[in-house]
Amino acid sequence: MAAGVLPQNEDPYSTLVNSSGHAAHMDENSGRPAPKYTKVGERLRHVIPGHMACSMACGGRACKYENPARWSEQEQAIKGVYSSWVTDNILAMARPSSELLEKYRIIEQFLGQGIKTIINLQRPGEHASCGSALEQESGFTYLPEAFMEAGIYFYNFGWKDYGVASLTAILDMVKVMTFALQEGKVAVHCHAGLGRTGVLIACYLVFATRMTADQAIIFVRAKRPNSIQTRGQLLCVREFTQFLAPLRNIFSCCDPKAHAVTLAQYLIRQRHLLHGYEARLLKYVPKIIHLVCKLLLDLAENRPVVMKSMLEGPVLSAEIEKTVSEMVTLQLDQELLRQNSDVPDPFNPTAEVAEFENQDVILSTEQEFDPLWKRRDIECLQPLTHLKRQLSYSDSDLKRAKAILEQGETPWTVPAQELLDHSLQHQKPTSHCYMPPTPELGFNKEALVQNTFSFWTPSKCGGLEGLKDEGSLLLCRKDIPKEVQRSRTFSVGVSCSHNPGEPVPPNFTSIHKDPEQVTHCRCEAPGGWVPGPVHEMVRSPCSPLNCGSSPKAQFPHGQETQDSTDLSEAVPHAGLQPELSAEARRILAAKALANLNEFVEKEEVKRKVEMWQKELNSREEAWERICGERDPFILCSLMWSWVEQLKEPVITKEDVDMLVDRQADAAEALFLLEKGQYQTILCVLHCIVSLQTLPMEVEEACLLHAIKAFTKVNFDSENGPIVYDTLKKIFKHTLEEKRKMAKDSLS
């Protein structure tokens, strides 16, 4: 983004870093990031002719943004270009030119730094009066072919200078960035690499980490000073955040809540978020149904589950948490210094109240700085890196937190463990989906000062009593398994048996109490994952599919932290029971699909399902972590709960009436439905077929439960027999046809 007519008081990068001038870009009344220009200044930038703006703003042909001599080495992450690393993998930069590419060997620098993609947000012919002359072939100051010939991907999204793009266009750009980051590092540029570039990177951070808009703006400005310049650009990031909120909602009755939708509406939302192969694969099938059916078959066949690395998100979350915390704290400290008023006695209650009432600079939207993963998921705060902040808050900051508490909000400064322990004591599920009440928190000022910014250091984890059910795998460890081997066996009992000659499964509470044994937080995550650099996953309590055995995980080398220990040294390997036959495993998986959970405590399953509902609503990483859930009853209950919470049944009364009236042939009946309907139904029926030959009563139970979930009609209701007879005939014929096709393909 061209910087336009820069304010006379704009500080250079070095000044911003040394004097922390970032706070100057915050609105003093609301504490939110403020635009860099006045309203009049913004208006002028839209009416001044381009050649005049270039001459007045950056020197015309002597454009400072294309002159490396104007920038320090610190401001040239890529030598020869005004550039900054916003994250370890995303580079914000001014536009390069053919002259600079050759003189500073920028393409070689890109390859050396691992940059595999360059994203250009300019329009051809833009800023023709700035810096180097434009290349006639491309309309830019360089030829894109120069990068592409070197194996670097090139994308161009034309974005008007000082303008904003549509939300759907930004979403497309963000998805391209997401794909590009899977290949390597990404460089983004416009003209100066400040406005449009900053907006796109901030929107990507919102998309990838679910942080708030203001957090993203603060973070980008901290890494790339003077970024995101106009009111429209600030509003663009905030509206993009609001635009994503309903799209991410999986379970409408769980926090963060959204309006219930139909299957067709959900598939439209899903298409907005998915990209690449996954978008094509799941065009007409909900992701949760496809994934659960796949995991169920993996469990039945005892196949390994391959998990891709999700390292970028958690590491980035930790970096963002640290940077935003420091920036907001810095702003508060500078405001207090500017007031230059006498500090009342902090131990005098009267003076304390008076100071609070006279506090005229309060972050009225402080919840905007509260990280989403803290505000919604207090129990999952630990970042991958063990960041130990040696900071404390002043008395006025403590009163601000007290005010937020009185308004019913969760202060982001409250020690995480204290919030968690208190909230777990007050959680009472009130509906089918998990909806924890806002806890009434009690804490003293001394505890707050002592624990401020010490988020989930290893010593903060405590025991597993309050964490094992709602921990976060990817926010608790840096070692991400590439493959998780399902080696737990099926069991037909509720309790775990133990062979005398095998080690006894450990007591996790005692392990955490022994600092010599464990120095790294190993909080059990949903589905039995144990975060930390472990080589042996441990799960408790036992379920029919994994009782008495232990899965194996392989981790990449070289990622262990200094204070991490091998769990295999501290935790004995759980004993293995003789595995059930393949047929027995398939039958048990089918019973889970039919909701015949006679071997599992229903309350335990319900609790786990509610927890997963909350996880999937709140965190993108939950899709990866759920692959580690080894209890088919939990997986199937989760899938059916999603089907049942839709605004309308998958198969409506009108659909059943149509099938009855047309007396449709069973072979063609499903194709009379909408494509999303029959593809969703076929996904479940294919899962049943893949379980191979099942006892008649088990298969019958699977079909009956599927009909009940898809129609929301009970068999004993008024039209129940007609609905069940019609659909059962169609479903059974589909199963027979699929089995016949499978048999023919093998012969």
Curated annotation (Swiss-Prot):
The terms under GO molecular function for this entry are:
protein tyrosine phosphatase activity
Signal peptide (from-to): none
Which residues, renumbered to this chain, carry the PTM Phosphoserine?
Answer: S392, S394, S543
Which superkingdom is the protein from?
Eukaryota
Question: Per its UniProt record, what InterPro entries does this chain match?
Answer: Dual-sp_phosphatase_cat-dom, Prot-tyrosine_phosphatase-like, PTP, PTPDC1_PTP, Tyr_Pase_AS, Tyr_Pase_cat, Tyr_Pase_dom, TYR_PHOSPHATASE_DUAL_dom
EC id: 3.1.3.-
Q: Which GO terms describe its cellular component?
A: cytosol; nucleoplasm
Keyword Aminoacyl-tRNA synthetase recorded:
no
Q: Which cysteines are joined by disulfide bonds?
A: none
Give GO BP annotations, semicolon-separated.
cilium assembly; smoothened signaling pathway
Q: Does the keyword Hydrolase apply?
A: yes
> Tyrosine-protein phosphatase domain: which residues?
82-253
Region annotation Disordered: where it falls in the sequence = 1-36, 549-570
Query: Could you tell me the keywords of this UniProt record?
Result: Cilium biogenesis/degradation, Hydrolase, Phosphoprotein, Protein phosphatase
Give the enzyme class.
hydrolase
Supply the CDD domains for this chain.
PTP_PTPDC1
Q: Where is the composition biased (Polar residues)?
A: 11-21
Q: When the coding gene is removed by deletion, what phenotypic consequences does the entry describe?
A: Elongated cilia.
* Active-site residue numbers: C190 (phosphocysteine intermediate)
Family membership: Belongs to the protein-tyrosine phosphatase family. Non-receptor class PTPDC1 subfamily.
Q: What does this protein do?
A: May play roles in cilia formation and/or maintenance.
**Protein known as:** Protein tyrosine phosphatase domain-containing protein 1
